[in-house]
Amino acid sequence: MDNFIFHNPTRLIFGKGMIAQLSQQIPADKRIMITFGGGSVKTNGVYEQVIQALEGRDYTEFWGIESNPDISTLKKAIESGKEKNIDFLLAVGGGSVIDGTKLISAGIPYDGDAWELVKKGSAQNTIPLGTVLTIPATGSEMNNGAVISCRETHEKYPFFSSHPVFSILDPTVTFSLPDYQIACGLADTFVHVMEQYMTKTNESYLMDRWSESILRTLVQIAPQIKENKQDYHLMSEFMMSATMALNGFIAMGVSEDWATHMIGHELTALHGMTHGQTLAIVFPGTLRTLADKKRDKILQYGERIWGVTSGVPSVRVSLTIEKTEEFFRNLGLKTRLDEAGIGDDAIEEIVRRFNERGAAYGEDGDVTGEVARRILQNCKSKKETTDTEGTSMKTVILTSFKSDVRAHMLQDLLKNEGI
Protein backbone atom coordinates (compact mmCIF):
# COMPACT_ATOMS: atom_id res chain seq x y z
CA MET A 1 0.00 0.00 0.00
CA ASP A 2 0.99 3.60 -0.59
CA ASN A 3 0.91 6.06 2.31
CA PHE A 4 -2.49 7.67 2.81
CA ILE A 5 -4.62 9.79 5.13
CA PHE A 6 -8.27 8.77 5.21
CA HIS A 7 -10.95 11.20 6.37
CA ASN A 8 -14.68 11.00 5.75
CA PRO A 9 -16.80 13.01 8.18
CA THR A 10 -20.20 12.46 6.53
CA ARG A 11 -22.84 11.01 8.84
CA LEU A 12 -24.81 8.36 6.94
CA ILE A 13 -28.48 7.97 7.90
CA PHE A 14 -30.01 4.98 6.15
CA GLY A 15 -33.45 3.41 5.95
CA LYS A 16 -37.18 3.76 5.43
CA GLY A 17 -38.71 6.88 6.94
CA MET A 18 -35.36 8.40 7.88
CA ILE A 19 -36.06 11.72 6.13
CA ALA A 20 -37.88 12.61 9.35
CA GLN A 21 -34.41 12.81 10.93
CA LEU A 22 -33.81 16.15 9.21
CA SER A 23 -35.12 18.15 12.13
CA GLN A 24 -32.49 16.56 14.36
CA GLN A 25 -29.61 16.98 11.93
CA ILE A 26 -29.86 20.71 11.11
CA PRO A 27 -29.32 23.19 13.96
CA ALA A 28 -32.49 25.11 14.79
CA ASP A 29 -30.95 28.56 14.25
CA LYS A 30 -29.80 27.96 10.66
CA ARG A 31 -31.15 29.83 7.63
CA ILE A 32 -31.59 27.00 5.17
CA MET A 33 -31.67 26.89 1.39
CA ILE A 34 -33.17 23.66 0.06
CA THR A 35 -31.99 22.88 -3.47
CA PHE A 36 -33.93 20.73 -5.92
CA GLY A 37 -33.78 19.54 -9.50
CA GLY A 38 -37.06 19.11 -11.36
CA GLY A 39 -40.45 18.27 -9.91
CA SER A 40 -40.12 14.51 -9.38
CA VAL A 41 -39.72 14.97 -5.61
CA LYS A 42 -43.26 16.34 -5.53
CA THR A 43 -44.68 13.19 -7.10
CA ASN A 44 -42.72 10.57 -5.16
CA GLY A 45 -43.45 11.97 -1.70
CA VAL A 46 -39.94 13.21 -0.92
CA TYR A 47 -40.82 16.91 -1.00
CA GLU A 48 -43.69 16.44 1.43
CA GLN A 49 -41.48 14.50 3.85
CA VAL A 50 -38.74 17.14 3.72
CA ILE A 51 -41.10 20.07 4.29
CA GLN A 52 -42.87 18.26 7.10
CA ALA A 53 -39.55 17.52 8.80
CA LEU A 54 -38.53 21.19 8.57
CA GLU A 55 -41.83 22.64 9.76
CA GLY A 56 -41.25 25.84 11.69
CA ARG A 57 -37.70 26.29 10.36
CA ASP A 58 -36.38 29.28 8.44
CA TYR A 59 -35.88 28.01 4.91
CA THR A 60 -36.10 29.00 1.27
CA GLU A 61 -36.31 26.81 -1.83
CA PHE A 62 -34.23 26.89 -5.00
CA TRP A 63 -35.46 24.80 -7.94
CA GLY A 64 -34.06 23.89 -11.32
CA ILE A 65 -30.59 22.40 -10.87
CA GLU A 66 -30.30 20.39 -14.06
CA SER A 67 -28.58 17.12 -14.86
CA ASN A 68 -24.89 17.97 -15.22
CA PRO A 69 -25.38 21.19 -13.21
CA ASP A 70 -24.71 24.34 -15.19
CA ILE A 71 -22.75 27.24 -13.79
CA SER A 72 -25.38 29.77 -14.92
CA THR A 73 -28.03 28.07 -12.78
CA LEU A 74 -25.72 27.73 -9.81
CA LYS A 75 -24.76 31.41 -9.96
CA LYS A 76 -28.43 32.30 -9.50
CA ALA A 77 -28.59 30.12 -6.39
CA ILE A 78 -25.38 31.68 -5.07
CA GLU A 79 -26.74 35.19 -5.57
CA SER A 80 -29.97 34.26 -3.79
CA GLY A 81 -28.03 32.65 -0.96
CA LYS A 82 -25.95 35.77 -0.43
CA GLU A 83 -29.02 38.03 -0.42
CA LYS A 84 -30.79 35.85 2.16
CA ASN A 85 -27.74 35.22 4.35
CA ILE A 86 -28.08 31.46 3.95
CA ASP A 87 -25.83 29.52 6.32
CA PHE A 88 -26.94 25.93 5.70
CA LEU A 89 -27.73 24.08 2.47
CA LEU A 90 -29.87 20.98 2.01
CA ALA A 91 -29.57 19.22 -1.35
CA VAL A 92 -32.59 17.05 -2.17
CA GLY A 93 -32.00 14.99 -5.30
CA GLY A 94 -29.42 12.94 -7.13
CA GLY A 95 -25.76 13.50 -7.84
CA SER A 96 -26.30 16.57 -10.02
CA VAL A 97 -28.26 18.42 -7.35
CA ILE A 98 -25.71 17.48 -4.70
CA ASP A 99 -22.76 18.39 -6.96
CA GLY A 100 -24.30 21.74 -7.77
CA THR A 101 -25.02 22.43 -4.11
CA LYS A 102 -21.37 21.80 -3.26
CA LEU A 103 -20.41 24.67 -5.56
CA ILE A 104 -23.18 26.82 -4.07
CA SER A 105 -21.75 26.12 -0.60
CA ALA A 106 -18.38 27.44 -1.80
CA GLY A 107 -19.82 30.26 -3.89
CA ILE A 108 -21.91 31.95 -1.19
CA PRO A 109 -18.88 32.98 0.92
CA TYR A 110 -16.75 33.70 -2.18
CA ASP A 111 -16.41 37.28 -3.44
CA GLY A 112 -15.56 36.48 -7.05
CA ASP A 113 -17.03 34.56 -9.98
CA ALA A 114 -17.91 31.00 -8.96
CA TRP A 115 -16.59 29.67 -12.28
CA GLU A 116 -13.14 30.74 -11.06
CA LEU A 117 -13.52 28.20 -8.26
CA VAL A 118 -14.40 25.50 -10.77
CA LYS A 119 -11.39 26.29 -12.95
CA LYS A 120 -9.20 26.35 -9.84
CA GLY A 121 -10.59 22.93 -8.95
CA SER A 122 -11.24 23.32 -5.24
CA ALA A 123 -12.44 25.56 -2.42
CA GLN A 124 -11.75 25.51 1.31
CA ASN A 125 -14.20 28.13 2.61
CA THR A 126 -17.71 26.68 2.46
CA ILE A 127 -20.99 26.72 4.34
CA PRO A 128 -22.26 23.36 5.64
CA LEU A 129 -24.60 21.17 3.63
CA GLY A 130 -26.61 18.01 4.09
CA THR A 131 -28.29 15.80 1.52
CA VAL A 132 -31.39 13.71 0.95
CA LEU A 133 -30.39 11.30 -1.82
CA THR A 134 -33.02 10.29 -4.39
CA ILE A 135 -30.89 8.71 -7.15
CA PRO A 136 -28.06 6.23 -6.41
CA ALA A 137 -25.13 6.71 -8.79
CA THR A 138 -22.45 9.28 -8.14
CA GLY A 139 -21.54 8.74 -4.49
CA SER A 140 -21.60 12.54 -4.08
CA GLU A 141 -23.64 12.09 -0.91
CA MET A 142 -20.53 10.84 0.91
CA ASN A 143 -17.57 12.50 -0.78
CA ASN A 144 -16.18 15.97 -1.38
CA GLY A 145 -16.21 15.86 -5.17
CA ALA A 146 -18.47 17.41 -7.78
CA VAL A 147 -18.54 17.94 -11.53
CA ILE A 148 -19.73 21.29 -12.87
CA SER A 149 -20.61 22.20 -16.47
CA CYS A 150 -20.67 25.35 -18.55
CA ARG A 151 -23.00 24.69 -21.46
CA GLU A 152 -22.16 27.99 -23.10
CA THR A 153 -18.55 26.90 -23.66
CA HIS A 154 -19.16 23.12 -23.68
CA GLU A 155 -16.87 22.60 -20.68
CA LYS A 156 -17.17 20.21 -17.74
CA TYR A 157 -14.68 19.98 -14.87
CA PRO A 158 -14.27 18.22 -11.52
CA PHE A 159 -14.44 20.37 -8.41
CA PHE A 160 -13.64 19.56 -4.77
CA SER A 161 -14.91 21.25 -1.62
CA SER A 162 -16.33 19.95 1.68
CA HIS A 163 -18.05 16.66 2.49
CA PRO A 164 -21.75 16.80 3.34
CA VAL A 165 -22.30 16.96 7.10
CA PHE A 166 -24.90 14.21 6.76
CA SER A 167 -26.71 12.28 4.05
CA ILE A 168 -30.08 10.55 4.32
CA LEU A 169 -30.60 7.46 2.16
CA ASP A 170 -34.12 5.99 2.02
CA PRO A 171 -34.29 3.22 -0.60
CA THR A 172 -38.07 3.59 -0.97
CA VAL A 173 -37.62 6.93 -2.75
CA THR A 174 -35.91 5.11 -5.63
CA PHE A 175 -38.91 2.91 -6.47
CA SER A 176 -40.30 5.34 -9.06
CA LEU A 177 -37.03 6.00 -10.90
CA PRO A 178 -37.12 5.46 -14.69
CA ASP A 179 -35.38 2.32 -15.93
CA TYR A 180 -32.82 4.34 -17.91
CA GLN A 181 -31.83 6.35 -14.84
CA ILE A 182 -31.34 3.15 -12.85
CA ALA A 183 -29.26 1.64 -15.66
CA CYS A 184 -27.03 4.71 -15.82
CA GLY A 185 -26.66 4.66 -12.04
CA LEU A 186 -25.59 1.02 -12.07
CA ALA A 187 -23.06 1.73 -14.83
CA ASP A 188 -21.72 4.78 -13.00
CA THR A 189 -21.30 2.78 -9.80
CA PHE A 190 -19.58 -0.08 -11.63
CA VAL A 191 -17.07 2.19 -13.34
CA HIS A 192 -16.41 4.17 -10.16
CA VAL A 193 -15.18 0.94 -8.63
CA MET A 194 -13.19 0.01 -11.73
CA GLU A 195 -11.38 3.37 -11.80
CA GLN A 196 -9.93 2.49 -8.39
CA TYR A 197 -9.55 -1.25 -8.97
CA MET A 198 -8.44 -1.75 -12.59
CA THR A 199 -4.94 -0.40 -12.09
CA LYS A 200 -2.06 -2.43 -10.64
CA THR A 201 -1.93 -5.87 -9.06
CA ASN A 202 -0.82 -6.66 -5.52
CA GLU A 203 -1.12 -3.12 -4.16
CA SER A 204 -3.64 -4.23 -1.54
CA TYR A 205 -5.40 -7.57 -1.17
CA LEU A 206 -7.95 -5.88 1.10
CA MET A 207 -8.84 -3.04 -1.28
CA ASP A 208 -9.11 -5.51 -4.16
CA ARG A 209 -11.53 -7.69 -2.21
CA TRP A 210 -13.61 -4.72 -1.10
CA SER A 211 -13.85 -3.53 -4.70
CA GLU A 212 -14.67 -7.01 -5.94
CA SER A 213 -17.43 -7.35 -3.36
CA ILE A 214 -19.15 -4.27 -4.78
CA LEU A 215 -18.67 -5.47 -8.37
CA ARG A 216 -20.06 -8.91 -7.56
CA THR A 217 -23.02 -7.31 -5.80
CA LEU A 218 -23.79 -5.15 -8.85
CA VAL A 219 -23.53 -8.12 -11.21
CA GLN A 220 -25.90 -10.06 -8.97
CA ILE A 221 -28.55 -7.41 -8.39
CA ALA A 222 -28.62 -5.65 -11.79
CA PRO A 223 -30.79 -8.24 -13.60
CA GLN A 224 -33.01 -8.62 -10.54
CA ILE A 225 -33.59 -4.87 -10.32
CA LYS A 226 -34.54 -4.88 -13.98
CA GLU A 227 -37.33 -7.32 -13.09
CA ASN A 228 -38.41 -5.61 -9.85
CA LYS A 229 -37.13 -2.12 -9.07
CA GLN A 230 -39.50 -1.81 -6.11
CA ASP A 231 -37.76 -4.52 -4.10
CA TYR A 232 -36.53 -2.79 -0.93
CA HIS A 233 -33.68 -5.25 -0.37
CA LEU A 234 -32.35 -4.90 -3.93
CA MET A 235 -32.56 -1.11 -3.98
CA SER A 236 -30.90 -0.97 -0.55
CA GLU A 237 -27.97 -2.96 -1.95
CA PHE A 238 -27.82 -0.68 -4.98
CA MET A 239 -27.94 2.49 -2.89
CA MET A 240 -25.18 1.36 -0.55
CA SER A 241 -23.06 0.04 -3.43
CA ALA A 242 -23.19 3.45 -5.10
CA THR A 243 -22.20 5.19 -1.88
CA MET A 244 -19.39 2.77 -1.05
CA ALA A 245 -18.03 2.95 -4.59
CA LEU A 246 -16.91 6.55 -4.21
CA ASN A 247 -16.60 7.50 -0.55
CA GLY A 248 -12.87 6.77 -0.34
CA PHE A 249 -13.15 3.40 1.37
CA ILE A 250 -11.84 1.34 -1.56
CA ALA A 251 -9.16 3.87 -2.58
CA MET A 252 -6.97 3.68 0.51
CA GLY A 253 -3.33 3.16 -0.43
CA VAL A 254 -3.95 2.13 -4.05
CA SER A 255 -3.51 3.65 -7.51
CA GLU A 256 -6.43 5.25 -9.33
CA ASP A 257 -7.09 5.69 -13.04
CA TRP A 258 -10.02 8.05 -13.94
CA ALA A 259 -9.16 8.26 -17.65
CA THR A 260 -12.56 6.81 -18.59
CA HIS A 261 -14.34 9.44 -16.52
CA MET A 262 -12.38 12.34 -17.97
CA ILE A 263 -13.12 11.19 -21.52
CA GLY A 264 -16.75 10.65 -20.55
CA HIS A 265 -16.98 14.19 -19.18
CA GLU A 266 -15.97 15.52 -22.59
CA LEU A 267 -18.69 13.48 -24.31
CA THR A 268 -21.23 14.97 -21.92
CA ALA A 269 -19.90 18.49 -22.45
CA LEU A 270 -19.99 18.17 -26.23
CA HIS A 271 -23.14 16.09 -26.73
CA GLY A 272 -25.13 16.31 -23.49
CA MET A 273 -24.96 12.57 -22.91
CA THR A 274 -25.95 11.16 -19.52
CA HIS A 275 -22.82 10.49 -17.49
CA GLY A 276 -23.45 6.79 -16.87
CA GLN A 277 -24.13 6.26 -20.56
CA THR A 278 -20.78 7.78 -21.51
CA LEU A 279 -19.00 5.38 -19.15
CA ALA A 280 -20.75 2.36 -20.65
CA ILE A 281 -19.33 3.38 -24.02
CA VAL A 282 -15.84 4.47 -22.99
CA PHE A 283 -14.83 1.92 -20.35
CA PRO A 284 -14.79 -1.18 -22.61
CA GLY A 285 -12.76 0.88 -25.08
CA THR A 286 -10.31 1.77 -22.33
CA LEU A 287 -9.86 -1.90 -21.49
CA ARG A 288 -9.35 -2.83 -25.14
CA THR A 289 -6.76 -0.09 -25.62
CA LEU A 290 -4.84 -0.72 -22.40
CA ALA A 291 -5.29 -4.51 -22.33
CA ASP A 292 -1.56 -5.15 -22.60
CA LYS A 293 -0.67 -2.81 -19.74
CA LYS A 294 -3.56 -3.90 -17.51
CA ARG A 295 -3.35 -7.56 -18.50
CA ASP A 296 -2.68 -9.06 -15.06
CA LYS A 297 -5.43 -7.07 -13.38
CA ILE A 298 -7.89 -7.91 -16.15
CA LEU A 299 -7.10 -11.59 -15.65
CA GLN A 300 -7.74 -11.26 -11.91
CA TYR A 301 -10.97 -9.34 -12.54
CA GLY A 302 -12.14 -11.85 -15.14
CA GLU A 303 -11.59 -14.79 -12.82
CA ARG A 304 -13.09 -13.26 -9.69
CA ILE A 305 -16.05 -11.41 -11.18
CA TRP A 306 -16.95 -13.28 -14.37
CA GLY A 307 -15.52 -16.74 -13.68
CA VAL A 308 -13.23 -16.60 -16.73
CA THR A 309 -10.59 -19.23 -15.96
CA SER A 310 -10.17 -21.26 -19.16
CA GLY A 311 -7.91 -20.52 -22.10
CA VAL A 312 -4.62 -18.78 -22.64
CA PRO A 313 -4.24 -15.34 -21.05
CA SER A 314 -4.99 -13.43 -24.25
CA VAL A 315 -8.25 -15.33 -24.71
CA ARG A 316 -9.27 -14.73 -21.11
CA VAL A 317 -8.56 -11.01 -21.44
CA SER A 318 -10.70 -10.83 -24.57
CA LEU A 319 -13.60 -12.73 -23.02
CA THR A 320 -13.47 -10.64 -19.85
CA ILE A 321 -13.74 -7.41 -21.82
CA GLU A 322 -16.61 -8.86 -23.83
CA LYS A 323 -18.44 -9.81 -20.64
CA THR A 324 -17.94 -6.29 -19.28
CA GLU A 325 -19.45 -4.75 -22.40
CA GLU A 326 -22.27 -7.28 -22.31
CA PHE A 327 -23.06 -6.25 -18.71
CA PHE A 328 -23.62 -2.65 -19.82
CA ARG A 329 -25.61 -3.74 -22.85
CA ASN A 330 -27.85 -5.92 -20.70
CA LEU A 331 -28.62 -2.84 -18.62
CA GLY A 332 -30.12 -1.39 -21.79
CA LEU A 333 -27.27 1.04 -22.49
CA LYS A 334 -25.36 1.75 -25.68
CA THR A 335 -21.75 0.58 -25.72
CA ARG A 336 -20.42 2.10 -28.95
CA LEU A 337 -19.99 5.68 -30.14
CA ASP A 338 -21.73 5.00 -33.43
CA GLU A 339 -24.90 3.99 -31.60
CA ALA A 340 -24.92 7.39 -29.92
CA GLY A 341 -24.36 9.23 -33.21
CA ILE A 342 -20.85 10.36 -32.28
CA GLY A 343 -18.21 10.44 -34.99
CA ASP A 344 -14.63 11.43 -35.68
CA ASP A 345 -15.21 15.18 -35.24
CA ALA A 346 -16.02 14.65 -31.57
CA ILE A 347 -13.00 12.39 -31.13
CA GLU A 348 -10.66 15.00 -32.57
CA GLU A 349 -12.18 17.75 -30.42
CA ILE A 350 -11.65 15.67 -27.28
CA VAL A 351 -8.05 15.01 -28.28
CA ARG A 352 -7.56 18.73 -28.91
CA ARG A 353 -8.90 19.57 -25.45
CA PHE A 354 -6.69 16.99 -23.77
CA ASN A 355 -3.65 18.34 -25.60
CA GLU A 356 -4.55 21.96 -24.87
CA ARG A 357 -4.70 21.24 -21.14
CA GLY A 358 -1.67 18.97 -21.16
CA ALA A 359 -3.96 16.31 -19.71
CA ALA A 360 -2.48 13.00 -18.61
CA TYR A 361 -4.67 10.55 -16.72
CA GLY A 362 -4.43 6.90 -15.72
CA GLU A 363 -2.62 5.34 -12.78
CA ASP A 364 0.72 6.26 -14.36
CA GLY A 365 -0.32 9.57 -15.89
CA ASP A 366 0.17 8.26 -19.41
CA VAL A 367 -3.32 8.59 -20.89
CA THR A 368 -2.62 11.66 -23.01
CA GLY A 369 -4.60 13.11 -25.88
CA GLU A 370 -3.14 10.55 -28.26
CA VAL A 371 -4.04 7.64 -26.00
CA ALA A 372 -7.53 9.13 -25.59
CA ARG A 373 -7.83 9.07 -29.39
CA ARG A 374 -6.95 5.35 -29.43
CA ILE A 375 -9.46 4.66 -26.66
CA LEU A 376 -12.23 6.46 -28.54
CA GLN A 377 -11.34 4.70 -31.78
CA ASN A 378 -11.78 1.47 -29.83
CA CYS A 379 -15.27 2.63 -28.85
CA LYS A 380 -16.51 2.52 -32.43
CA SER A 381 -18.85 -0.21 -33.60
CA LYS A 382 -17.40 -3.65 -34.30
CA LYS A 383 -17.06 -4.46 -37.97
CA GLU A 384 -17.54 -8.16 -37.31
CA THR A 385 -19.11 -10.21 -34.55
CA THR A 386 -17.03 -11.15 -31.52
CA ASP A 387 -19.40 -13.90 -30.45
CA THR A 388 -17.15 -16.81 -29.51
CA GLU A 389 -19.81 -19.37 -30.36
CA GLY A 390 -18.67 -20.75 -33.71
CA THR A 391 -16.02 -18.07 -34.08
CA SER A 392 -12.28 -18.61 -33.82
CA MET A 393 -10.46 -16.81 -31.04
CA LYS A 394 -8.21 -15.26 -33.69
CA THR A 395 -11.30 -13.54 -35.08
CA VAL A 396 -12.33 -12.39 -31.60
CA ILE A 397 -8.93 -10.79 -31.08
CA LEU A 398 -8.77 -9.31 -34.57
CA THR A 399 -12.20 -7.67 -34.23
CA SER A 400 -11.91 -6.54 -30.62
CA PHE A 401 -8.51 -4.87 -30.31
CA LYS A 402 -6.29 -2.35 -32.03
CA SER A 403 -2.92 -3.04 -33.60
CA ASP A 404 -0.37 -3.02 -30.76
CA VAL A 405 -2.49 -4.99 -28.30
CA ARG A 406 -3.74 -7.28 -31.06
CA ALA A 407 -0.23 -8.24 -32.14
CA HIS A 408 0.75 -9.15 -28.60
CA MET A 409 -2.37 -11.25 -28.05
CA LEU A 410 -2.11 -13.07 -31.36
CA GLN A 411 1.52 -13.92 -30.64
CA ASP A 412 0.47 -15.36 -27.29
CA LEU A 413 -2.32 -17.37 -28.93
CA LEU A 414 -0.12 -18.73 -31.70
CA LYS A 415 2.52 -19.87 -29.20
CA ASN A 416 -0.07 -21.79 -27.25
CA GLU A 417 -1.39 -23.39 -30.44
CA GLY A 418 2.14 -24.57 -31.24
CA ILE A 419 2.39 -22.55 -34.42
Where are these regions (language model features)?
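Short Gly/Thr/Asp-enriched flexible loops that form oxyanion-binding sites at enzyme active sites
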Residues: 78, 97-111, 142-143
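Glycine/serine-rich anion-binding loops at beta->alpha junctions
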Residues: 86-102, 134-140, 270-273
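A glycine/threonine-rich phosphate-anchoring loop and its flanking beta-alpha core
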Residues: 10, 20, 110-206, 300
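C-terminal charged capping/lid subdomain of soluble metabolic enzymes
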Residues: 308-389
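Active-site segments that bind and position negatively charged phosphate/pyrophosphate groups
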Residues: 196, 200-323
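ATP/NTP phosphate-donor binding region
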Residues: 1-88, 337
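Acidic/polar low-complexity segments and flexible, solvent-exposed patches
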Residues: 390-419
